[in-house]
Each structure stands twice: as structure tokens, then as C-alpha cells.
């Protein structure tokens, strides 16, 4: 006979193993204070809940790590594909040539099929093949050359004097020299012939600017070195090198800069609110051109004179195609 069935109804809940959880049956204990609620509350297993929360937290962390790894892989793939595309574009622009025909405007665009195979284990950034628009710099025949020779306006050169220098002594004893260490950590010295300016640093390095030719720049640098020698320093003349050449010219006609920047977006930028000239970055030779609507052109970034001449002969037919006809 079942023990629970022999007990009164009000005591069956107490005798059952789940008596503490049986609703409707009040529980009384002499140890309970007077007025304590008699309705039992279910006992929660906090250990199982904490384990579930920890598992969910670990899963979320793993998902975040996987997402970060995927983003890093995508960024690396994009960088690799951009590098491959840039190298291919540079190679194609260096190999392009045009055949000029009389009575026709120079060709300004060239559509070339570019196939970029994805690297092993990567996904292609764009479908292959693609047909990017790359500007052409048409070669002008000798009979149709521009006839304009850019004039050199400034040459920047550097030289190493091979010894440490006391700039205060140089500024006090040399003529046409100024030194303000709070403003600039070099002595600024000037001479009249050739009219140039030198920046002399305490390490012995010197920068010479303002010369109009390579010979003038070398001559001016030697004169500055001689001045330092006369002040008692064991100065030498080492590692003379031309760092930058700036030239300018005028094509004698106005230019539509808006059309030029739309045609050559890869190589040019034009923000008239910030700077009135169009900035054109030529790849070969590596020259930066400042083109103004009036027809004035400034070329900078050359190491030798021939690079300035070559860059202008490349850009002249393009400027001719964007000549204003009003």
C-alpha cells in the first residue's frame, strides 16, 4: 500500500519527495519567523544558467574574431589587387604610342583590356578582364613640335661639408647671415652672384636654392663652402647633388581645365576653391605640372633638365586638345 495514500490530504504533499515544490500546500517550520510567507518558491539552478551564458559569450567572441579575420583578409586582397592594377596601368601607359593623322584632333582616351588574375587563395576584387580608361600622352612628330622651351626658374641642390658647425659663430662672423634657432634650426646665408640662398645646418649639411642653372647651383654651393672654411671650420665639398628643378612656360592660349580633369581623373586634381591651378602628376617622366587657365604651366620634380623638356612635349598635345575657342 502506498504510504502517501494512507496519509491525510493536507499531509500528502509534505511526505512526497517534491513536497517543497507542490503548490497549494503550505509549509511550516518552527524555525521560520512569524509572518514569513508560506508559499514555496522554485529553486533555480544558477550553475546551469552561468554555463549557458559563458558558452554564448564564447560563441560571440569567436564570431567577432572570425569577422575581424575576414575583414583583414579582404583588405589584404584589395591592396594586392590595387597594386597589381597600378603596375599594369603604369606599364601600359609607358608602352602606348599614337599615330598622328593630319586634320584630326589628338586622341585623348585609350581603352585597353587589362586582365588581373587573382592571387592564390584570394577572391577577385572585380571581374576579369576589365577595361579601365587610361590617358595617352601622344607623341608629337618632329615637324609638329611645340617650339616652346621651358625656362628653368629654380634649382635645389644639397652638399655635405663633412664637419660639425657652430651656427652661432657663423651667424656672428659671416656677412649676410641670419640665425634664429627658435624659428628655424639653420643659418640662412645669401650671396649676390649667383643670387642664391643657402641653409646651413649644424650637422654639416647644406641646401642651396635659387640658382637658374646646374652650373650656377654648383658654383654657389662652392662659394658657401669657402665662406665656412674661412671662418676656421674644416669644411669639404662632398656629395653634391641636384634634388629638384623647377621650370615654367606659356602655351599662349587659354585651357579648359574642367574638361581636362574629367578626362584625366587618374592623374590630375582640380580644386579651384583651394588652388587656381590644375595639378597633373605625370608617371613617366615623374613630373608634377601646375596648369593654369591662362596657359601658364609650371613643371617641378625633375632631377635633370631633359625630364622637364620631355614632360612638356608630352603634355602639350593634350593641352592643345582642350584649348578654349571662345
From Swiss-Prot:
Gene Ontology cellular component list: cytosol; euchromatin; female germ cell nucleus; female pronucleus; male germ cell nucleus; male pronucleus; nucleus; RNA polymerase transcription factor SL1 complex
Ranges of the Sequence repeats in the UniProt entry: 152-228, 242-319
Pfam families: TBP (PF00352)
Protein's cellular compartments: Nucleus
Parts forming coiled coils: none
Record has DNA-binding as a keyword: yes
Binding site residues for DNA: 154, 190, 205, 244, 281
Secretion signal span: none
InterPro entries xref list: TBP (IPR000814), TBP_CS (IPR030491), TBP_dom_sf (IPR012295), TBP_eukaryotic (IPR033710)
Disordered: annotated span: 1-21, 114-146
GO molecular function list: aryl hydrocarbon receptor binding; enzyme binding; RNA polymerase I core promoter sequence-specific DNA binding; RNA polymerase II cis-regulatory region sequence-specific DNA binding; RNA polymerase II core promoter sequence-specific DNA binding; RNA polymerase II general transcription initiation factor activity; RNA polymerase III general transcription initiation factor activity; TFIIB-class transcription factor binding
CDD domains in alphabetical order: TBP_eukaryotes (cd04516)
BP GO annotations: mRNA transcription by RNA polymerase II; positive regulation of transcription initiation by RNA polymerase II; RNA polymerase II preinitiation complex assembly; transcription by RNA polymerase II; transcription by RNA polymerase III
Superkingdom in the source lineage: Eukaryota
Keywords linked to the UniProt accession: DNA-binding, Nucleus, Repeat, Transcription
Ranges of compositional bias, category Low complexity: 114-125
Subunit structure: Binds DNA as monomer. Belongs to the TFIID complex together with the TBP-associated factors (TAFs). Part of a TFIID-containing RNA polymerase II pre-initiation complex that is composed of TBP and at least GTF2A1, GTF2A2, GTF2E1, GTF2E2, GTF2F1, GTF2H2, GTF2H3, GTF2H4, GTF2H5, GTF2B, TCEA1, ERCC2, ERCC3, TAF1, TAF2, TAF3, TAF4, TAF5, TAF6, TAF7, TAF8, TAF9, TAF10, TAF11, TAF12 and TAF13. Component of the transcription factor SL1/TIF-IB complex, composed of TBP and at least TAF1A, TAF1B, TAF1C and TAF1D. Association of TBP to form either TFIID or SL1/TIF-IB appears to be mutually exclusive.
Known role: General transcription factor that functions at the core of the DNA-binding multiprotein factor TFIID. Binding of TFIID to the TATA box is the initial transcriptional step of the pre-initiation complex (PIC), playing a role in the activation of eukaryotic genes transcribed by RNA polymerase II. Component of a BRF2-containing transcription factor complex that regulates transcription mediated by RNA polymerase III. Component of the transcription factor SL1/TIF-IB complex, which is involved in the assembly of the PIC (pre-initiation complex) during RNA polymerase I-dependent transcription.
Protein family according to the UniProt entry: Belongs to the TBP family.
PANTHER family the UniProt entry points to: TATA-BOX BINDING PROTEIN
Protein name: TATA-box-binding protein
Amino acid at each position: 500500500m502506498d504510504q502517501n495514500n494512507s496519509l491525510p490530504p493536507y499531509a500528502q504533499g509534505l511526505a512526497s519527495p517534491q513536497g517543497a515544490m507542490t503548490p497549494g500546500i503550505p509549509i511550516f517550520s518552527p524555525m521560520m519567523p512569524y509572518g514569513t510567507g508560506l508559499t514555496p518558491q522554485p529553486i533555480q539552478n544558477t550553475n546551469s544558467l552561468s554555463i549557458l551564458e559563458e558558452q554564448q559569450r564564447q560563441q560571440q567572441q569567436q564570431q567577432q574574431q572570425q569577422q575581424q579575420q575576414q575583414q583583414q583578409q579582404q583588405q589584404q586582397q584589395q591592396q594586392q589587387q590595387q597594386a597589381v592594377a597600378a603596375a599594369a596601368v603604369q606599364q601600359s601607359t609607358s608602352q602606348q604610342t599614337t599615330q598622328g593623322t593630319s586634320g584630326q584632333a589628338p586622341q585623348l582616351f585609350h581603352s585597353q583590356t587589362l586582365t588581373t588574375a587573382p592571387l592564390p587563395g584570394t577572391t577577385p576584387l572585380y571581374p576579369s578582364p576589365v577595361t579601365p580608361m587610361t590617358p595617352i600622352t601622344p607623341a608629337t612628330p618632329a615637324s609638329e613640335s611645340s617650339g616652346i622651351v621651358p625656362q628653368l626658374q629654380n634649382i635645389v641642390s644639397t652638399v655635405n661639408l663633412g664637419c660639425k658647425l657652430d651656427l652661432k659663430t657663423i651667424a656672428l662672423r659671416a656677412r649676410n647671415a641670419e640665425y634664429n634657432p627658435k624659428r628655424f634650426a639653420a643659418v640662412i646665408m645669401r650671396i649676390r652672384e649667383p643670387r642664391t640662398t643657402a641653409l646651413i645646418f649644424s650637422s654639416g649639411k647644406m641646401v642651396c636654392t635659387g640658382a637658374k642653372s646646374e652650373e650656377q647651383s654648383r658654383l654657389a654651393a662652392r662659394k658657401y663652402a669657402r665662406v665656412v672654411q674661412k671662418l676656421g671650420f674644416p669644411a669639404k665639398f662632398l656629395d653634391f647633388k641636384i634634388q629638384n628643378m623647377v621650370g615654367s612656360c606659356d602655351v599662349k592660349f587659354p585651357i579648359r581645365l574642367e574638361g581636362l580633369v574629367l578626362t584625366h581623373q587618374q592623374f590630375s586634381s582640380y580644386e579651384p576653391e583651394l588652388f587656381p591651378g590644375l595639378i597633373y602628376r605625370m608617371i613617366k617622366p615623374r613630373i608634377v605640372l601646375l596648369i593654369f587657365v591662362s596657359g601658364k604651366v609650371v613643371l617641378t620634380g625633375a632631377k635633370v633638365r631633359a625630364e622637364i623638356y620631355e614632360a612638356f612635349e608630352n603634355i602639350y598635345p593634350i593641352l592643345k586638345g582642350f584649348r578654349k575657342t571662345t
